[in-house]
Regions:
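HAD-like aspartate-dependent phosphatase fold
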Residues: 2-146
């Protein structure tokens, strides 16, 4: 992977404490950790069983510019995909060839959708529905613990 496409430096995050014990650091206000799917989100939905298509599919219109803008603004960009480790090389080359800037690539996301993420940090979900445009804020009902 080309060094200009992956930030190697570590972020200076404030170490937080809880009851005298160190806990995971938190991003500064205004910065986000973007976890972005690949297949069906920034390019065609290519299943692992048809991996020969991974090299030739094209990015969705606006995805490169939007993601690279977030990267330039200082946000953390992580691609999180159901592609297996066997597909890492072709995936990294595809991202590089199409000019995506990112920090991390996580493979082996569980397949099948219907994701339910439980975390002690704020989690926001945005469902991609066919168009890369500016984000807007809307209030919706969500499922929470009582």
């Amino acid at each position: 992977m080309s060094s200009n496409l992956k930030k190697e430096e570590t972020m200076d995050l404030d170490q937080q404490e809880f009851n005298g014990n160190a806990i995971s650091p938190v991003l500064p206000d205004g910065l986000k950790n973007y976890l972005i799917d690949i297949d069906g989100t920034i390019t065609d939905d290519v299943p692992n069983e048809e991996s020969w298509r991974m090299e030739t599919c094209l990015p969705y219109l606006g995805s490169v510019d939007t993601i690279n803008d977030w990267y330039s603004e200082g946000h953390i960009i992580t691609f999180f995909t159901s592609r297996t480790e066997n597909h890492r090389k072709v995936t990294e080359e595809w991202l590089q060839n199409h000019g995506y800037f990112y920090h991390n690539l996580l493979m082996n996301k569980p397949r099948g959708g219907n994701y339910h993420w439980i975390d002690n940090h704020i989690v926001r979900a945005t469902r991609y529905e066919g168009k890369w445009t500016k984000m807007t804020k809307k209030k919706l009902n969500i499922e929470v613990f009582e």
